[in-house]
């Protein structure tokens, strides 16, 4: 069972965070809130999203699992105005999600969860390098790198005390170095990995709105981005596998 009301802007921000990686997901409702954890079809990236019940204007739920078509939900979101209260209700018998706002009442058929990949396990990998940066600065750097290449290196140079982002194309090159004066915080541990900008560009659109994003790095390891949404009552984690660097 689910019966909840949420601000349209918060709902949109949450759906956009998921849509950056996948077109469908298993959404779990509990007494504490909503959550999902899913990987993209290529097994390259993962998202974990949690919305505390305090995010909602009203919230009642029992343990439920829903198969959500993210594309359909985004289409419905396009009809919502800024700040509209959105009512969500799970019709258990018909397996439909009722979405109501303004004078509209949508009844969206849920996907069969048996056709959606099971939730992946939580990552346990050690990523000792830590950087905290504003979402706007991170997004801008990703955009800048995408002008010259389809991949970007993220790293930490502990001797210089900097976090750097570097991209190299066939003829062009860009490097951005950020020290303590440009970062919120830095744990200066040697780290460097190469990543696909195709994924990062989509993630960056969501992260651009975050006051701060924590980046966790290793050497030729995945990168983890964690940040809050909904005034700290919602939490997002992206995990992106590295690209193999050519010799």
Curated annotation (Swiss-Prot):
Function: Sliding clamp subunit that acts as a moving platform for DNA processing. Responsible for tethering the catalytic subunit of DNA polymerase and other proteins to DNA during high-speed replication.
Organism field: Methanosphaerula palustris (strain ATCC BAA-1556 / DSM 19958 / E1-9c)
Keyword Transferase set for record: no
Pfam families the record matches: PCNA_C, PCNA_N
Sorted UniProt keywords: DNA replication, DNA-binding
Gene Ontology molecular function: DNA binding; DNA polymerase processivity factor activity
Family that this chain belongs to: Belongs to the PCNA family.
Protein name per Swiss-Prot or TrEMBL: DNA polymerase sliding clamp
GO annotation, biological process: leading strand elongation; regulation of DNA replication
Family annotation (InterPro entries): DNA_clamp_sf, Pr_cel_nuc_antig, Pr_cel_nuc_antig_C, Pr_cel_nuc_antig_N
Subunit structure: Homotrimer. The subunits circularize to form a toroid; DNA passes through its center. Replication factor C (RFC) is required to load the toroid on the DNA.
Lineage: Archaea, Methanobacteriati, Methanobacteriota, Stenosarchaea group, Methanomicrobia
SUPFAM superfamilies: DNA clamp
């Amino acid at each position: 069972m689910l019966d909840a009301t949420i601000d349209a802007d918060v709902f949109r921000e949450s759906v956009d965070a998921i849509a950056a990686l996948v077109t469908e997901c298993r959404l779990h409702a509990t007494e504490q809130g909503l959550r999902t954890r899913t990987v993209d079809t290529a097994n390259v990236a993962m998202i974990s999203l949690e919305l505390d019940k305090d995010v909602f204007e009203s919230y009642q739920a029992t343990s439920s699992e829903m198969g959500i078509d993210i594309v359909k939900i985004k289409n419905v979101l396009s009809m919502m105005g800024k700040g509209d209260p959105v009512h969500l209700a799970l019709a258990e018998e018909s397996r439909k999600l009722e979405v109501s706002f303004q004078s509209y009442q949508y009844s969206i058929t849920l996907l069969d969860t048996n056709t959606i990949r099971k939730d992946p396990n939580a990552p346990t990998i050690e990523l000792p390098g830590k950087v905290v940066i504003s979402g706007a600065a991170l997004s801008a750097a990703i955009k800048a790198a995408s002008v010259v290449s389809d991949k970007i290196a993220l790293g930490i140079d502990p001797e210089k005390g900097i976090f750097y982002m570097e991209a190299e194309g066939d003829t062009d090159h860009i490097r951005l170095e950020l020290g303590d004066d440009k970062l919120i915080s830095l744990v200066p541990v040697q780290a460097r990995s190469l990543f696909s900008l195709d994924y990062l560009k989509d993630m960056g659109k969501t992260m651009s709105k975050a006051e701060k994003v924590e980046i966790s790095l290793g050497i030729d390891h995945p990168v983890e981005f964690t940040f809050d949404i909904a005034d700290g009552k919602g939490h997002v984690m992206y995990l992106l596998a590295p690209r193999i660097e050519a010799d």
